[in-house]
Every structure is written in structure tokens, then in C-alpha cells.
Regions:
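Localized chelating/binding microdomains
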Residues: 10-20, 48-51, 61, 102, ...
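Residues that recognize and position ribonucleotide moieties
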Residues: 30, 49, 71, 96, ...
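Cyclic nucleotide-binding regulatory module and flanking cytosolic helices
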Residues: 1-29, 84
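Cyclic nucleotide-binding regulatory domains
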Residues: 37-98
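Phosphate-/nucleic-acid-contacting segments
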Residues: 146-198
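Short, basic/aromatic recognition patches
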Residues: 30-37
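A small-molecule sensor/coupling module
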Residues: 91, 110-147, 151
């Protein structure tokens, strides 16, 4: 088990050496069922998760309680509401498992203690935060610049295995369309290249 965990951690491009060491030394293995809330909006993030197996989504709820997924995370991804964890402010996001997950978990106190005691930890967490910011800017820009059909096609090309694991109603919300509209997009794409884009 430890060798598999080490391999998974070493594959992480965005998790630095210090965080890898902390996940190995201080992290705990936790198994979580599908559709379980890891972080509720309005709460301070208490845990940093490394996904060993499974899938997690980050979502936001509007005033009426309807949720929209803003990002998906899969094996070897590290996830939390980083801004909440570091600032101590309540998160505006929810973190929910989409599949049963095996997670490696670091608690906030350990991360913050190491943040203060390890000389390179602040710069490494800053680099991680900057990377996440770039990802969010790209997501935002693509959401504005591309149609839902174009975004779906891009996901089909770049992440077909991951795309197949996302429930269609969640994917529809992520793309900003209804499940019926997503069904039409998928049907049109299957029917051939001469089809009209939405």
C-alpha cells in the first residue's frame, strides 16, 4: 500500500516535495462513499485531500440552493478549498465525492504548523495557489469564449476516460446547460461532423 501511495504522490506535478513528505508522514487514509460532503459552504476547510482513487467535485450553490460544479478532481489530484484553509475564512464552495474515494488526508493544523516551521513551505503553497488561480482563470475564460458544445468536445478529446465518470446531470450543470440540452449536444456530435453546433 505504501509503495502505491508513494507512486501516486510522485506522479503529482503540482504537489511539491514538502507536501509529498507531509502526506506520507502525517496523512491518514480515509475511505469515503460516493455523494458525501467533504466540505460544506460556509465552513472553514479543515482538511487537504490527496485522491488515491475516486472522483471529487468542487461546486457552488446559488441563493435558491441549486448547485453548479466548477471543477472535477480525480486520482493523484490534491484538493481542498485552499483559500479557506490558508486564510481561515469560510469557504464559498462545497467539496463532494462523485464516486467512492480512497483519500489521503492532512488536517489544517498540521499544514499550518508546517507552513510556519518549514522555510520553503510558504513559497511552495504560494506556487500551488498560483497554479490553482491559473486553472480557474482558464476555466472562466473558456466558459465565456466557448460554447457548451465546444467545451464538451474539448473534454471528449483531452479527458475521455474522466468524462465518462461524470454523471450527466452534473456535467450539464458544469457546462451551463440543462441535461436535455446536453443530451442533444451528445446526440448531434454522434450523428456526424456536418451537424450544427449549439
Amino acid at each position: 500500500m505504501r509503495l502505491d501511495l508513494t507512486r501516486a504522490i510522485l506522479r503529482l506535478m503540482h504537489v511539491n516535495t514538502v507536501l509529498r513528505d507531509y502526506f506520507l508522514e502525517f496523512g491518514e487514509d480515509v475511505n469515503v462513499d460516493a455523494n458525501k460532503l467533504l466540505l460544506r459552504a460556509g465552513e472553514v476547510a479543515k482538511y487537504l485531500y490527496l485522491i488515491q482513487s475516486g472522483a471529487v467535485r468542487l461546486c457552488v450553490r446559488n441563493a435558491e440552493g441549486a448547485e453548479t460544479t466548477v471543477q472535477f478532481f480525480f486520482e493523484d489530484d490534491m484538493v481542498c478549498s485552499l483559500e479557506s484553509m490558508l486564510s481561515g475564512c469560510p469557504s464559498g464552495l462545497e467539496l463532494i465525492t462523485m464516486e467512492a474515494c480512497q483519500l489521503r488526508v492532512l488536517d489544517r493544523d498540521t499544514v499550518l504548523t508546517k507552513f510556519q516551521s518549514h522555510a520553503t513551505m510558504p513559497s511552495e503553497l504560494l506556487a500551488l495557489t498560483q497554479q490553482r488561480l491559473v486553472e480557474y482563470i482558464n476555466l472562466y475564460t473558456i466558459a465565456i469564449a466557448q460554447t457548451p458544445t465546444q467545451r464538451y468536445q474539448a473534454m471528449l478529446v483531452s479527458q475521455p476516460d474522466k468524462l465518462a465518470r461524470i454523471p450527466l446531470h452534473i456535467l450539464a450543470g458544469y457546462l451551463g446547460v440543462t441535461p436535455v440540452h446536453l443530451s442533444r449536444i451528445r446526440r448531434r456530435l454522434k450523428s456526424g461532423p456536418g451537424s450544427q453546433a449549439f
